[in-house]
């Protein structure tokens, strides 16, 4: 009876062996990355076995399904959890919940004369199968069919990554069919919650790739941070070499400014590595420049630029250590070395005798106890309007004297009083004839012209003088113009290195008008010159408060026809001396 039924069903099956009309239905699958099938089929591994009863029952079900499809009756074959069919010794495993609604199941689960071989892919340690697709081999005259997989592993040859981070698949050169990407393999997915249409399928492999990418990016950022923090070099003995190493380091990470004795160098580098932590002297130098005041910082830079010029005299001073060592070697018979060193000292003293002598006298000046008390009392507390000195039609109050404290700006009264002291000293023998204008002279001349200051020289003939001093006040800065009538030149001296060509031209025109008025003669302007002293020719201030002191000391040295050899570090001493000189109306 069973044989007759099998023959009938076989006849019906042969009549139905043709493609089913219509498109294939959807496959609803819920599988993890560990249930991917293998691409390789090895027929030698499994020996052939005789058909069993369960294979026959499965063939009957397939025949009924094909018959129902032929006559148009709706029919569904729902597999139970883990349904296994053995046909010629091959075992097919399908997850629970899978629905097969087209003729592909007939081709997949073939009849007794077929041999379909499925092999599960080996699982990798991360739970992802190494084989992303399944291949079904049919021994009958049916063409080979390939069931595309719905996921790719990172080890798959068909998996590639674009520079933008998106994934796409390439065709396998060994396969005759073209594989489609995962996004295109499934175009629809029915939601379990009564989904509302089309959405992109969820893929565990994709989540793993995204996590892997995020992890790589996080590690890259950590490496960049570690490279930025760990790029500092240990301090070396040489300061210049350490600065050079730090400069090379900062060139690769951002922009860097180096300020060395007033010279400023800026390196521009890509903006994305702009800010980097550094250690060492360069960082402290930058922080000092960042938080310093604007004016004081500018003056400090200018002063540092010419610090070497102010210390030239110190470099030329005889080395006392050499002299002491030479004397200690007298008993050792090194007379030749001693003679050479003594000759060097003599040459240095011959080259700069007056400069060294003047500087030493200034530095070796000592105040007595009485002088110290007078100076401290004048600079101490008291009524600011109290008059402490009166001469030259000027009155100096306690408030005026207190401008001589360290880091205070001098006012007009103190500067005018000191200029008059210089004029009084010039009346002594051995000093050049000197005249000094008030600090209000130049502003009046500039605003009102010659007629506004015509009477300022009523009792003085400027052309009988040898030197004429004109203090200049430019907003918040003091400078000096020296008219040397002997050399027919005007010199502008500025402790900040500024130029005063326009000021010299105005004063030269004043001399021309003065000559016409007092002597009825014109000056030969071709014989006169004016010149702004360059910063390396005169001492420069290193702060923002000693411009008035520099102006007074310029006038002091020039009125004695002495070279200007003082430096910034002598300003506290000069301030104390000026207090005593104004109180006693006498220059020391």
Curated annotation (Swiss-Prot):
Biased composition (Polar residues): 172-184
Keywords: Activator, Cytoplasm, Cytoplasmic vesicle, Hydrolase, Membrane, mRNA transport, Nuclear pore complex, Nucleus, Phosphoprotein, Protease, Protein transport, Thiol protease, Transcription, Transcription regulation, Translocation, Transport, Ubl conjugation, Ubl conjugation pathway, Wnt signaling pathway
Modified residues (Phosphoserine): 32, 332, 343
Subunit composition and interactions: Binds to SUMO2 and SUMO3. Interacts with the C-terminal domain of NUP153 via its N-terminus. Interacts with MTA1.
The protein's name: Sentrin-specific protease 2
Post-translational modifications: Polyubiquitinated; which leads to proteasomal degradation.
Enzyme class at the top of the EC tree: hydrolase
Region (Disordered) residue spans: 157-184
EC id: 3.4.22.-
Gene expressing this chain: Senp2
Short motif Nuclear export signal, span: 316-331
Protein family per UniProt: Belongs to the peptidase C48 family.
GO annotation, cellular component aspect: cytoplasm; cytoplasmic vesicle; cytosol; nuclear body; nuclear membrane; nuclear pore; nucleus; PML body
Function: Protease that catalyzes two essential functions in the SUMO pathway. The first is the hydrolysis of an alpha-linked peptide bond at the C-terminal end of the small ubiquitin-like modifier (SUMO) propeptides, SUMO1, SUMO2 and SUMO3 leading to the mature form of the proteins. The second is the deconjugation of SUMO1, SUMO2 and SUMO3 from targeted proteins, by cleaving an epsilon-linked peptide bond between the C-terminal glycine of the mature SUMO and the lysine epsilon-amino group of the target protein. May down-regulate CTNNB1 levels and thereby modulate the Wnt pathway.
Summary of the tissues where the protein is detected: Highly expressed in testis. Detected in brain, heart and thymus.
Molecular function per GO: deSUMOylase activity; SUMO-specific endopeptidase activity
Organism of this sequence: Mus musculus
Residues spanned by motif Nuclear localization signal: 28-31, 47-52
Record note on domains: The N-terminus is necessary and sufficient for nuclear envelope targeting.
Catalytic site positions: 477, 494, 547 (nucleophile)
Signal peptide annotation: none
Region of interest: Protease: 394-558
Example of a GO biological process term: Wnt signaling pathway
């Amino acid at each position: 009876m069973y044989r007759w039924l099998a023959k009938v069903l076989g006849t019906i099956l042969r009549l139905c062996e043709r493609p089913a009309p219509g498109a294939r239905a959807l496959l609803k699958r819920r599988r993890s990355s560990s249930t991917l099938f293998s691409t390789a089929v090895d027929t030698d591994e499994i020996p052939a076995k005789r058909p069993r009863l369960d294979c026959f029952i499965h063939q009957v079900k397939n025949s009924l399904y094909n018959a129902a499809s032929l006559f148009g009756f709706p029919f569904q074959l729902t597999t139970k959890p883990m349904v296994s069919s053995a046909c010629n010794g091959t075992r097919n495993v399908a997850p629970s919940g899978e629905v097969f609604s087209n003729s592909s199941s007939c081709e997949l689960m073939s009849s007794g004369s077929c041999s379909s071989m499925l092999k599960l892919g080996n699982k990798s340690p991360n739970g992802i199968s190494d084989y992303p697709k399944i291949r079904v081999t049919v021994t009958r005259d049916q063409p080979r069919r390939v069931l595309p997989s719905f996921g790719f592993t990172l080890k798959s040859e068909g998996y590639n990554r674009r520079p933008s981070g998106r994934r796409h698949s390439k065709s396998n050169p060994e396969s005759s069919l073209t594989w489609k990407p995962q996004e295109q393999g499934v175009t629809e997915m029915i939601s379990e919650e009564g989904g509302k249409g089309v959405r992109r399928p969820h893929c565990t492999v994709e989540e793993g790739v995204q996590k892997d990418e995020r992890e790589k990016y996080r590690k890259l950022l950590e490496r960049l941070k570690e490279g930025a923090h760990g790029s500092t070099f240990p301090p070396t003995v040489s300061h210049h070499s350490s600065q050079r190493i730090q400069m090379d380091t900062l060139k690769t990470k951002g922009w860097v400014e180096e300020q060395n004795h007033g010279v400023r160098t800026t390196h521009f580098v890509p903006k994305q590595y702009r800010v980097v932590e550094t250690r060492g002297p360069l960082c402290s130098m930058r922080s000092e420049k960042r938080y310093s005041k604007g004016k004081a910082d500018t003056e400090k830079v200018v002063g540092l630029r010419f610090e070497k010029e102010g210390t030239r005299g110190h470099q030329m001073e005889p080395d006392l250590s050499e002299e002491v060592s030479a004397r200690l070697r007298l008993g050792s018979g090194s007379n030749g070395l001693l003679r050479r060193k003594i000759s060097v000292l003599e040459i240095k003293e011959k080259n700069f005798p007056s400069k060294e002598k003047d500087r030493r006298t200034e530095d070796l000046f000592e105040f007595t106890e009485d002088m110290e008390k007078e100076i401290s009392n004048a600079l101490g507390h008291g009524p600011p309007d109290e008059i402490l000195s009166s001469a030259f039609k000027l009155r100096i109050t306690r408030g005026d004297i207190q401008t001589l404290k360290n880091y205070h700006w001098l006012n007009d009264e103190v500067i005018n009083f000191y200029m008059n002291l210089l004029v009084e000293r010039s009346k002594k023998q051995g000093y050049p004839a000197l005249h000094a204008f008030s600090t209000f002279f130049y502003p009046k001349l500039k605003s009102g012209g010659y007629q506004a200051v015509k009477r300022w020289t009523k009792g003085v003939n400027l052309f009988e003088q040898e030197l004429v001093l004109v203090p200049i006040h430019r907003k918040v800065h003091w400078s000096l113009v020296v008219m040397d009538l002997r050399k027919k030149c005007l010199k502008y001296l500025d402790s900040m290195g500024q130029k005063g060509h326009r000021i010299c031209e105005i004063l030269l025109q004043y001399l021309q008008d003065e000559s016409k008025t007092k002597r009825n003669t014109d000056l030969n302007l071709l014989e006169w010159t004016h010149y702004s002293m360059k910063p390396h020719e005169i001492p420069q201030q290193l702060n923002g408060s000693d411009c008035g002191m520099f102006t007074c000391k310029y006038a002091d040295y020039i009125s004695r026809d002495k070279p200007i050899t003082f430096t910034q570090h002598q300003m506290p001493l000069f301030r104390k001396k000026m207090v005593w000189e104004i109180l006693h109306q006498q220059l020391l």
